[in-house]
Amino acid sequence: MLSMSNDRADTGGRILRAAASCVVDYGVDRVTLAEIARRAGVSRPTVYRRWPDTRSIMASMLTSHIAAVLREVPLDGDDREALVKQIVAVADRLRGDDLIMSVMHSELARVYITERLGTSQQVLIEGLAARLTVAQRSGSVRSGDARRLATMVLLIAQSTIQSADIVDSILDSAALATELTHALNGYLC
């Protein structure tokens, strides 16, 4: 027998998956809580018990999605080389991700690019800072405040993801990955 907490987690997961499918189909700016509930097979009050509004659902969905991508791309070591390899691979996946690209072309993206750090960005900064601290101890990453370094790494990678399409005629996917690798290695040495 499933516990109520498993049912609750499954319902939350269905809601987030429904939100993701709405974003891909309609774009972030046209997603409604009613459509998310319909696709998840739940009532609107069920959604409201978990999130206060559509924007909160979007934030949770993005955080969950980015965390899943991070889990899919292994970190093969504790040094700078392994970390840079993972960051470049994650950036490559996110550049080709329908959900992320749908979000990138929305008003929501403008908020998280120009006005404030979102939850997923903060999670990435904290995770990167922890990994950079380990790499600093081994001497493969230069000294400095790991959180500041992580924030700059996020900005570099985020810019690459956002701008890949506009520079595609100059930097195809492979060249972009090569240049991002050089940029990150140069910054972290």
Curated annotation (Swiss-Prot):
Residues 9-69 form the HTH tetR-type domain. Coiled coil: none annotated. It comes from Mycobacterium bovis (strain ATCC BAA-935 / AF2122/97). Residues 32-51 bind DNA. GO terms for molecular function: DNA-binding transcription factor activity; transcription cis-regulatory region binding. Signal peptide: none annotated. Keywords: DNA-binding, Transcription, Transcription regulation. It comes from the Bacteria. InterPro entries: DNA-bd_HTH_TetR-type_CS (IPR023772), Homeodomain-like_sf (IPR009057), HTH-type_TetR-like_transc_reg (IPR050109), HTH_TetR (IPR001647), Tet_transcr_reg_TetR-rel_C_sf (IPR036271). Disulfide bonds: none annotated. This is Uncharacterized HTH-type transcriptional regulator Mb2274c.
